[in-house]
Amino acid sequence: MCTSGQIIGSLLVLSVLEIGLGVSSVAVGAVSFSLALREHKPQLGDSSPFLLCGICGILCAKKKSGLVMILFSACCICGLIGGILNFQFLRAVTKKTSSLYPLHLASMSLACIGIGGCTLSSWLTCRLASYEQRRMFSEREHSLHHSHEMAEKRLRAIEITDLPSCPVVPPTPELPTRK
């Protein structure tokens, strides 16, 4: 079973990979845009959702709060959808033209790697959330157990201090006299 530190480390590595993919995708998009302007050809898709996904992943690894984990999961899902749509768009464009094939292949490869990274990041986020949930339940259980122990000690202390200092012997009932 992975520890929280291992999960966070893996999440950081994947987030840096996603940022790299996002920057690379933006660069490929800029090159394709300049080529599209010169040749009047359709522009390639853009995988910049991976950039946003990577930034949210680093934030998630640092904060570890529930809200940030939900935000990161949403970004991963958006990255998955964006990557799949980008891949499908590029596949359709590649069939029509072959002059930009190396650029299309690079964009499709970035989209595939980004899809894989988003999938792994989503899985790791679920693992991290599960780990944090177990940790919180364990802390709550420990705290509850500790509060019960303290309550029992207080009750014993109250019982001891409420006793009179000298023992009181109950009176013995008198026996009836015989006639």
UniProtKB/Swiss-Prot annotation:
InterPro entries: TMEM196
Subcellular location per the Swiss-Prot or TrEMBL entry: Cytoplasm; Membrane
Residue stretches spanning the membrane: 11-31, 44-61, 67-87, 100-120
UniProt keyword terms in alphabetical order: Cytoplasm, Membrane, Transmembrane, Transmembrane helix, Tumor suppressor
Recorded topology in the membrane: Multi-pass membrane protein
GO biological process, one term: negative regulation of cell migration
Gene Ontology CC annotation, any one: membrane
Biological role: Acts as a tumor suppressor in lung cancer. Inhibits tumor cell growth by inhibiting cell proliferation and migration and promoting cell apoptosis. Inhibits metastasis of lung cancer by suppressing beta-catenin expression in the Wnt/beta-catenin signaling pathway.
Descriptive protein name: Transmembrane protein 196
